[in-house]
Amino acid sequence: MKNEEEEPLSPMARVFQSPDIDLCAIINIGFKTKINPDVVLDALKQNVYKHPRFSSKLSENGEKWIETEVNVEDHVIVPYIDPEDICEGGQSFVDDYISRLTLIPLDRSRPLWDIHILNVKTSYAEAVGVIRFNHALADGMSFISLVLACTHKTSNPDMLSTAIPSVKRRSTVSHSLKKTGWFLTAIFTIGSTMRLIWNTLVDMFLLFATMLFLKDTKTPLKGGANVRSNPKTFYHRNISLDDIKLIKNAMNMTINDVLLGITQAALSSYLNRRYEHENNNEEDGVLTSYTNNLPDRIRFRAGCTVNLRSDIGFKPLAEMMVKDSKCRWGNYFSFIILPLSISLETDPLVYLNKSKAMMARTKHSYQAALTYFLIKISLKVLGAKATTSLFNQHLMNITTCVSNVMGPMEEISFNGHPVAYISPSSYGHSHALLIHYTSYAGEMTITITVDPTVIPDPHKICDDMEESLKTMKAVLWERGLLKEAYKV
């Protein structure tokens, strides 16, 4: 019998496993070949005990991990698939299967994860593996490190997957200022510090206001009180990562800036159509043409995940598991609130400029670190129930959440099974819309998670994102800005 050892949960893990939230990650991985279940079982039997989170269960009070025996067969599900069930298409079957999973809770008497093998051909893959686990086990960065540790390069099966380069946080002091005299440097430092303090105070005031009373505008994308208990549906689309990098270089911004600009443009277009449809219905079926159907002064905010590790690049799994590692395993991230601009712009580059300015400001604030610290203090002072209630209220009062995770740079394979795409998301949240971006092998996968009773057509949001990317690239080309970007 395995000795039971206990380890406390991190603050974010305690929040995520709370019955009032019970946030679960669900990762849809497409493969280019059919999946051999025996290969998956053998690999898990050899490796599951190397990772304590996947061989531990929660204590009864939800505060500690307890190591336990793992019967791998209980965690790997290979459902019988009736050919008649996929007569309308494999993609529809997989989508419905994953949607039903969001209504089935994980068994808390054993480690909080399972794997579902669906040997069904879809639009993008020959077979699909669905990995589901309680978000208390890990965040997106930790999961990708686990993927890298379990896979090999498709181009060279003898080599482990390409490690993603280590990324350091950018300095807030420009190189030109470092070369100036001490007086100008001191003036800049004082001004920058004052701005940092002011931004942090404003952000924390808005955070508390959001938890207590400040709500987003009720739009066709905002869910109601029961959205958390409704089933979720998932939709994903691949776009070119090279196109995103071209725009990034041409506009002198980051990939996150570009993705946020695309998100603002796409959601503005989608909402404009939804409002047009509602206006037309209200006029007894008389169709009218509107250029701008958006209400004035829409408050539309997104929670954005922020990695709190001092080393924000990826590290080998073994290094992440070491105590006091600068890039450690777990849920070491926090949230910031981004006020998205929902408006119709004649110049699509306006969305990019707005996102760049917004992200530059958020980087000059301690909101993320303070939010994590306050959650930690609140758990000690108020307890888990009160803390999760405040956290959930904060989520309910904003409209969506957005995240971006770097994936492997080259195509990878799991024991001879080449991976076609990686599409992560989550459920258990109080939003009708969730947006995840994941890069993999030269492509960016957009994953949209929706409550279908609120958003029946998530594919149209992806259409708008794809069209926004094309439009931005075309405008930059017309203005001659992409020619310089190609040289970078």
Curated annotation (Swiss-Prot):
Gene from which this protein is expressed: WSD8
Enzyme Commission code(s) on record: 2.3.1.20, 2.3.1.75
A GO term from the CC aspect: plasma membrane
Organism: Arabidopsis thaliana (Mouse-ear cress)
Catalysed reactions, semicolon-separated: an acyl-CoA + a 1,2-diacyl-sn-glycerol = a triacyl-sn-glycerol + CoA; a long chain fatty alcohol + a fatty acyl-CoA = a wax ester + CoA
Cytoplasmic side stretches: 1-195
Active-site feature positions: H135 (proton acceptor)
Keyword Acetylation: no
Pathway, per record: Glycerolipid metabolism; triacylglycerol biosynthesis; Lipid metabolism
Entry superkingdom: Eukaryota
Transmembrane portions of the chain: 196-214
PANTHER family: O-ACYLTRANSFERASE (WSD1-LIKE) FAMILY PROTEIN, WAX ESTER SYNTHASE_DIACYLGLYCEROL ACYLTRANSFERASE 10-RELATED
Chain's role: Bifunctional wax ester synthase/diacylglycerol acyltransferase. Involved in cuticular wax biosynthesis.
Localisation per UniProt entry: Cell membrane; Endoplasmic reticulum membrane
Protein's name in the database: Wax ester synthase/diacylglycerol acyltransferase 8
Tissues where this protein is expressed: Mostly expressed in flowers and siliques and at low levels in stems.
GO molecular function: diacylglycerol O-acyltransferase activity; long-chain-alcohol O-fatty-acyltransferase activity
Membrane topology (UniProt): Single-pass membrane protein
